[in-house]
Amino acid sequence: MATLRRLQEAPRHLLVCEKSNFGHDKSRHKHLVETHYHNYRVSFLIPECGLLSKELKSLVMDIGPYYSVKNLPLHELITHEFINTFVKKGSFSALTYNTSIDEDNTVALLPNGKLILSLDKDTYEETGLQGRPSRYSGRKSMKFVISIDLMDLSLNLDSKKYRRISWSFKEKKPLKFDFLLAWHPTGTEESTMMSYFSKYQIQEHQPKVALSTVRELQCPVLRSSGLAGEPEEACSALEFFDWLGAVFCSADLNNEPYNFISTYCCPQPSAVVAQAFLCTITGFILPEKIHVLLEQLCHYFDEPKLAPWVTLTVQGFADSPVAWREKEHGFHKGGEHLYNFVVFNNQDYWLQMAVGANDDCPP
C-alpha cells in the first residue's frame, strides 16, 4: 500500500518568486541570467503590441550562431591550444546532445571553464579519475559526477594532475560525444569555430525564430508591488506563471463546456488586450545574448506604452548536467529548469525560477 501511495504522488516541483527593481544596486537579475548556462528556448510576450520595434527585431534576428560537432573526442576540450583560444578569450559553452542525463554519459563545459562529466558507474571507474556519486542515482550509486577546472589545469600543463587527465581521455578511456558549441569572445580577435574543428563533422546553425500575434488575449491584472496578489484587485505571481504557460502552449483560456482538452481559464481579475506579440527563439543560446535581450525589453518602456508589463521566459536543456551555476541537475519526470522575468513599466520586476524533482532550490 505504501508503494502504491508513493507511485501516485506527484514529483515535487519548486517555484521561487522574488521582486526587485532593475535600478537597485542589489538586484540579482544579471547574475541569475549569467549563471543559467545552457538555454534552448527564449520567449517574450508583449501585450498591446502588433509589431516589433526595429531594435528588438534586429536583436532577435542577430542572436548569434551555434554549432554542432559529431564524435568530438573529449580530450580536444582540455588541450592547451583549445583553452588558450576559446576558454581564456571569452565565454565558451559546450553540451552533449542526443543524450539522456538519467541514462547516458553526458558532458558540459561551462563558461567559467569548468568541465562537468556525468558518467555511469562503469565508465566512471574506467576513467580512473576522482569524482563523487550523483545526488540523484539512488541508494546504489550508478551515476558519478567529475568536475575539472580547465583554468586551473592550464596553469601547469606539466603537472601530474593534467597528465593523468590527458592520459585518461586519450588512452585509458577515450570518450567521444556529439556536442553543441557556442562562444562569445570578449576581445576583438575572433577565432572561428568552423576552422578550429574543421577535421570533425561540424555544422553552423542559426536559432529558429517564431513570431506570432495573439488576438483578443485575456491577461491577468498585476501589481508590481505584490507577488501574492490581492483579492479582486490583482493576480498572484503563481497564477500568472500558470497563465503564461497556458499561453505558450496555445491553450484555450475560456473554459468552455465543449472543450475537452483544457478546462483552464484566465485568473481573475483580468483584462482583454486587442493583441499581444509573442516571439520564441530556439537553439543553443548564450546567457550574454539573453542579458542583452532583457536590457532591450527594459528599454521598451522608455517611451509611453499601453502595455503595463512584458515577459521574458528562458528554458534550459532538460538533459544538461547542471541547472544554475554548478548545481547538479537531474531529469526524473521532466527535467525542467527555467526562469521568467515580468518586467513592469516602472522598472520593477518579478523573477520566477522553476525546477523539477531532481534539482536544488534555485539560487
Swiss-Prot record:
Domain of life: Eukaryota
GO CC annotations, alphabetized: multimeric ribonuclease P complex; nucleolar ribonuclease P complex
GO BP, sorted A to Z: rRNA processing; tRNA 5'-leader removal
Subcellular location per the Swiss-Prot or TrEMBL entry: Nucleus, Nucleolus
Pfam families per record: Ribonuc_P_40
Functional summary from the UniProt entry: Component of ribonuclease P, a ribonucleoprotein complex that generates mature tRNA molecules by cleaving their 5'-ends. Also a component of the MRP ribonuclease complex, which cleaves pre-rRNA sequences.
Protein name per the record: Ribonuclease P protein subunit p40
